[in-house]
């Protein structure tokens, strides 16, 4: 989940401080409203076909700073050898957000999407007609499609906030991200946040038993508080908080609870980052992204209750592989799901900026979930339908270029086209006699190409210095300003590390690594052996000039059309068999030593170039 961080509180301090605090009023009074479970009554099925009502919103999410009392610190206490599940009632009504109500309570988006068939041994998948790619990914960017239009070429007008780098915080740890420009100047422009409105109903988790458990407790006790959860184990800690395995009292459901000390966040000027992460989590509804079940605040802590992934992260899983690298088949599975996650985020105007194996978690069914959004950048995006010319189809790549109805696994031939996906208006008006005289390789002339959806925030610009040293894009290191192309650079580094067991530009120290990223060419080791397609994809992604980088203009669509993914059925990717399914046994710590995580304490201020 998140790695070591300076100033992390122990598990007992979280629970003991909550039980013994006297409430003051650090924030304007209000009532925090957690996210609600999706209503099954809103799901509408008719013969296997689903309908979706998309409501467009033009309202904005206004960032508001919290007012916190200074000087409140946690009392250092010894860790208990046995965690207690008994906690006194806690009134958090005085420690909520200034507005008191989540955006999700104000905006209802009824989204009757298909079920998430993510069981590793499932024998049934939704039919391609019901789950082809345009229905499973493109339509999920519900509230960001405010200005979708059809044009002859991509006409994407995007704007984003500019962040000024005033200070530097670096961590020598490989697992900890670095962040500069946390002074509060990285607030999003109000006009760029309309796509981040909270989604009340999340169809991808409609049948999740965790929703039922939360609803049962809420019906019985009202608002969820810290007393309703029993913290079992510390899973990890990061720059703005610690993550615990938590069990909802009276149920057998487990969650991952991120606990953040509000006083420390205020002192380190990280409140805005915590708020950004919460708002992003509220807006997500995707099979490979986390679900925020609820969130609440005490006088001291801000807590996010999310999905728990028992499989750990891909970094730990890679360490257990022979040679400490994955097979190419396994890599293709993991990076394909990560690619869809990044595509969805970009459609919402979210640049992730922190992709690395440590942030890719493995669910209980073996599929992945992207985590940690506190470094993400929010910006505006204008999804555009672009008419594709026949020239795009006849280029020498030798693989299909159209998503949705054209199978990506074969060359443009008659048997590649699904007749059910086309209506007569897509066919040419020539007679059958003329059509029969056409050779097979001219089939593309008979079909009007489907438009492509371009939703890449290419004009987004930020001056922040954020990320992990080995994954930083050259434009970030140079301080030239960066946009969505940084996610495709990190995607290339991520692909390289999974295939070869190490990153391509790692130096003897962090400073040497940064110089290698800027000045050293990309090299591949002799072992292990990987396919030409994999190397070619990495070369396209790790181009140092962002404007020449693969996916710079057309986003994930370009990458999905690469030969490396030619055997991927994007429509049914959730039904694919994972390379490895984690064991369901959770080993809980038994001693204080197992629970304690010491802060790294090695933050440095470094001037680059």
Curated annotation (Swiss-Prot):
Protein kinase domain ranges (all copies): 229-565
GO MF entries: ATP binding; protein serine kinase activity; protein serine/threonine kinase activity
Domain of life: Eukaryota
Assigned keywords, A-Z: ATP-binding, Kinase, Nucleotide-binding, Serine/threonine-protein kinase, Transferase
Active-site residues, Swiss-Prot/TrEMBL: 354
The enzyme's E.C. designation: 2.7.11.1
Comp. bias regions, Polar residues: 1-19
Enzyme class: transferase
Gene3D superfamilies reported in the protein's UniProt record: Phosphorylase Kinase, domain 1, Transferase(Phosphotransferase) domain 1
Family stated for the protein in its record: Belongs to the protein kinase superfamily. Ser/Thr protein kinase family.
Protein name: Protein kinase PVPK-1
Species per Swiss-Prot/TrEMBL record: Phaseolus vulgaris
